[in-house]
Each structure stands twice: as structure tokens, then as C-alpha cells.
């Protein structure tokens, strides 16, 4: 099995569709049957719910979706040595490196949100991710030493990466030969937005699409109601609902520290790495959900906020006016917090 972004393959998404897969009830004669297409990409699942398409159209669309997502993976993967991203990473050149417009846009958004989170959302943290065993490298047999961490930190930093936009070509440029860009924190969000654009190109105006924990939507579901998305409780029980939201044509993404981890020397190590310390996070923030104009933005914000921890994250949320829902672990229970902007999307919440 190929895993493109995370060591744990096919993790259950921290967000899932609500009520969009059910067949129309007989009493609701106006309802339109929803077709659900599914597949695998980037070490996780993709899914598309689309009302009112027939079997032939479904088969054609599924093939187009998979082809597009395979291309996205070939663009962004750190597990494919011949991906566009890995060719940049493996190059020691400090000269401008030509990239696609999509790659330039992803990196530009990541750098912007990285700056707004005081460097907490850092796409150059790849050497540390690999050091701790959450990238293509094997898991370490012991916790890395401070010397190893410092050596990897010296190869990171958003200030070492620049996007150059010219009229007909975009470039990435690094000023450290060993700079290693890892876009796994935003790959799902970009792919979900890309799926939404594919739906539009195909003339589909009602859809809910997801890649892993990032979703995008437009229009109404099969019953003529807003698409609803459930946020999972941060437990090992799948599909346990914490809250339900109407995303109303926005992007949504959740970052969680409770699923992708391993234990070493008696310590539970999260896959979320703090660029400042070079170590997995240890605070009590276990889930961050962000609703934003695009899934890419939501995916970038949720990572940065997760790294910051609850109090610093709240400061950024208030300063930037973000729609955010956070869950912290308090002893044996969980506590939730949401920004005023998030409340307008909330349908229900469970204690």
C-alpha cells in the first residue's frame, strides 16, 4: 500500500458528511438521490456527494476525479521521489526553481498564514517531521537527542523560502541548500478545493467534496437543505459526533493530535511538530476545526493553531477574526471553545 503523506494509511477523517448519503425518504417527493463517489489518495480517502447524476455520469466523473487527485499527489507528495515537490527538495540549487502556478499558490498561502501564526505553520519543518518518524523515514528507535533536533532545526525556517511570480512562470527559491518543503499540512485542503473546481468545470453546482479532513461544498444537498458536516469527538471511536455545522459554500478542515501518533520510551508522540522546539506538541489542545473561504486556507490555519496551543491560538483567532472550534483535553473529559465567527455555522453541539 502506498502512503503519500502520513505514515498511518487511510486515517479516518476528523470531519464526515451528515445525512447526505441517505436515500430520499418517500414522503419527500422533491428530494433528489445523492450519488456518493469514493476513492483513495494521499494516504487517505476522497469522497464526493453529488445530487442528481446517473450511473454513466458517475463512472465518468469518478475516473476524472481519481486522475486529478493522482496528479495532485504527483505534485505534492514527499513519498514519491519523482514528484514535483521532491525534485525541488532534492536540488541543492539556490537559483529560482520553476514550478507550476498551483505549487506557487499553495506555497504563497502557506507562507502568508505561517507569518500570521508567528511561524507555527511552517512548511519547511520537513526535516524535523522526518527525524521524528512521521515522514517517509522510519520511526526512530529512541527519542532524538537535542543535538539531532538542533541540527534539523538549522535546516528549517520560512524566511529561507521565497515565491517569485513572473508573467508566464512561477518559481520557488531557497537560500539553504538543504531546505526541505513538506506540504502535507495543506495538501488535503488544496486537493479538496481542486475537486470543487473540477465540479464547477463539469457543470455541477451542488456538491460536497472531501479529501481526508478537508472539505468544500456548494449549493444544497439532495433534500434541498444545506450540506451538513460533523466534527468528530477526539476519541478512538469512529464517527462519534461532537458538533454539526452548515459550511454554506466554505472550506472546512480539522487538525487533530489524537490519531496519528506512536509511543516511544513510554511517551505518546504526536505527529504535530512545533517548529520552535523541534519536538512534538505536548499541550492539551487535541482538535482544531477552521471554516474559511477555501479548504486550503482552513487546512493551513488549523495546523498553525494546533501547534500554538489553546491560549496562543485564541489570540490569533481573535486578531484574525477566524471561524474556529477547538477541543481541549481536561483530565478525563473534553472542553470546547468556539469563536463568534464559528457560531454562525453551528447547527448543534454535544457535550
Curated annotation (Swiss-Prot):
Its membrane topology: Lipid-anchor
Major localization class: membrane
Positions with a binding annotation for Mg(2+): 185, 299, 302-303
Gene3D superfamilies noted in UniProt: ApbE-like domains (3.10.520.10)
Localization annotation: Cell inner membrane
Catalytic activity: L-threonyl-[protein] + FAD = FMN-L-threonyl-[protein] + AMP + H(+)
GO CC annotation, single: plasma membrane
EC numbers, comma separated: 2.7.1.180
Family matches, as InterPro entries: ApbE, ApbE-like_sf
SUPFAM superfamilies (alphabetical): ApbE-like (SSF143631)
Signal sequence extent: 1-19
Residues bound to FAD: 42, 79, 120-122, 182, 188, 273
NCBIfam families: PRK10461.1
The protein's assembly and partners: Homodimer.
The protein's name: FAD:protein FMN transferase
Gene: apbE
